[in-house]
Structure formats: structure tokens, C-alpha cells
């Protein structure tokens, strides 16, 4: 039977039958109703701990969270999956998706970049652990994109010092920028300041 109405969802949410919730969660997942699926997977996940279905539930729960853009929790759940099921056929994919969730949390270059640095570290861990992965090229591209963001941030800091006429600090920051990012496309501009 197809779950369609909001009423069906509310009934299954309040239902104590774990097997019915599991079936409904998978149905919502297959129909790409990620929020409903994630809510149900969250509810049933503790009840299936240690059982054969736990692997599938954990992966689907993390995937649902990714699809509703809850990157913080999705990253945690994918990492949890890799730790719990390191030999799973889905372990490599989960490791990549965890790193990808960190990438998605990286803010624009004008903001503080702790999340960007963390994302680079997680992607690099994936690259190091799965050097033959089909996702290697994607992960490397994401690392490069994040490094460019760090370059932009560092260059903008130097420009800001110059703008407020703190030339001594501008020179220090821009010299450091040039040595930290020798191949940067901003090199000429940094030397100009």
C-alpha cells in the first residue's frame, strides 16, 4: 500500500510497530520523501541496533539527512556508518559522502574558514584511505576548490589591512600569503600591494 497522505505519515509516526515504521521509512526513501524517511529512520534506528537491518537503516538515514541538507548530522551519521561497518560494500561511498558533507558546510570565503580547513582534512583522509576510488577525482577537485577559497580569504585579509592603511600588517600578511600560496593567481596583485 502506498503512503500518500499527511494523515498516513502522522499515523505511522505515532505507531509503536517498529516493522511497520521500517517499511514506511523505506517507502518514503524510495519515493525521495527525505524528511519523512529521516524522521522514521531516526525513530527506529536504536531499536535495530545490532540487528542485520541496522547497516541499511544507518546508511539510508544518513543519506536522507544529506538530501534534506542537514550536512552536520549527515556527516556524523556517515562517519558512524564507516566505523560500524568498515567492511560494508557501502563503506567507501559513506566515507566519501561524509567528507562531501563537510565540504557542503564550508562557508563563503568572506567568513571564518575553520569548516573549510576541516573539510579539506576530511577529503584528504578519504583520498589517502581510498586511493583507487572512483570518487578520487571528485574529492581532489573539491579539495582544490576549498584551497582556492582559503587563498581568497588570505588575500582579502591582506587587502583589508592595506585599505585601512595598516601598511606594515598588509606587507606581513601579503608576504606570508605569497609564501603560503606560491602558485596563486593573486600573486601579481599581492606583490602590487
Where are these regions (language model features)?
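Acidic, polar-rich low-complexity tracts and alpha-helical solenoid repeat scaffolds
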Residues: 1-193
Amino acid at each position: 500500500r502506498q503512503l500518500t497522505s499527511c494523515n498516513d505519515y502522522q499515523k505511522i509516526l505515532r505507531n509503536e510497530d517498529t516493522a511497520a515504521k521500517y517499511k514506511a521509512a523505506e517507502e518514503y526513501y524510495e519515493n525521495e520523501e527525505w524528511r519523512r524517511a529521516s524522521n522514521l529512520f531516526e525513530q527506529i534506528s536504536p531499536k535495530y541496533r545490532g540487528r542485520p537491518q541496522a547497516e541499511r537503516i544507518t546508511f539510508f538515514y544518513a543519506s536522507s539527512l544529506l538530501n534534506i541538507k542537514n550536512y552536520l548530522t549527515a556527516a556524523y551519521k556517515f562517519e558512524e556508518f564507516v566505523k560500524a561497518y568498515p567492511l560494508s560494500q557501502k563503506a567507501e561511498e559513506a566515507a566519501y559522502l561524509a567528507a562531501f558533507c563537510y565540504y557542503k558546510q564550508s562557508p563563503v570565503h568572506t567568513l571564518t574558514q575553520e569548516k573549510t580547513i576541516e573539510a579539506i582534512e576530511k577529503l584528504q583522509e578519504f583520498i589517502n584511505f581510498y586511493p583507487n576510488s572512483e570518487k578520487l577525482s571528485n574529492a581532489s577537485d573539491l579539495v582544490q576548490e576549498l584551497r582556492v577559497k582559503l587563498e581568497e580569504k588570505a588575500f582579502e585579509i591582506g587587502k583589508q589591512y592595506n585599505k585601512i592603511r595598516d601598511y606594515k600588517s598588509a606587507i606581513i600578511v601579503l608576504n606570508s600569503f605569497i609564501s603560503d600560496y606560491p602558485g596563486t593567481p593573486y600573486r601579481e596583485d599581492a606583490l602590487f600591494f
